[in-house]
Amino acid sequence: MRIWVDADACPNVIKEILFRAAERVKTPLILVANQPLKTPPSQYIRSLQVAPGFDVADNHIVQNVEPGELVITADIPLAAEVIDKGAHALNPRGEFYSKENIRQRLMMRDFMETMRSSGEHTGGPAAFNHGDRMEFANQLDRFLAKTSKS
C-alpha cells in the first residue's frame, strides 16, 4: 500500500503530518508535483516532479495508483478517477470521498464553476484551520490503523 499526494496545492502542515505517518507505519509516501518539493530524508518518502502542465500530476497519479491505495487531494475530478480505480481519496480537510458522495461533489463543483463563469462571485473555501488539520490527522490515523490490520 502506498500513499500518493497531489502535492502542488497540499498545505505544508498536511505534508508534515504525512511525513510523520509514513515513517511511523513504514508506508511509502509519494508526493507528485509540477515543481520541486522539499522532503525529509527517508526511505519511505519521495517526491516526483512531473512536467508542467494542466493535470500532468493528476494523470500520473491516476496511471500509477493501485486499488486499496490512498490518494490525498482536494481535486474532486482526481478523487473521482482514483475511486473508480478502487483506491481511496482523502482531502486535506479530513473528508473521505466515496462512491456515494463523489458524484454530488462533482455536480456542485461544476455548478459553482458555471456560476463563476457567468460573473457570479461565489467566494472560495473557508480558510484552512486547526480543526481541519486535526480532522485530517484523525482520519489518516484511522485509515492506516484499519489497513495495517488487513
From Swiss-Prot:
Question: Sorted alphabetically, which CDD domains does this protein's record hold?
Answer: PIN_YqxD-like
Query: Pfam families annotated for this entry?
Result: DUF188
- Record's family? Belongs to the UPF0178 family.
NCBIfam families reported in the protein's UniProt record: PRK00124.1
Q: What is this protein called?
A: UPF0178 protein HCH_06960
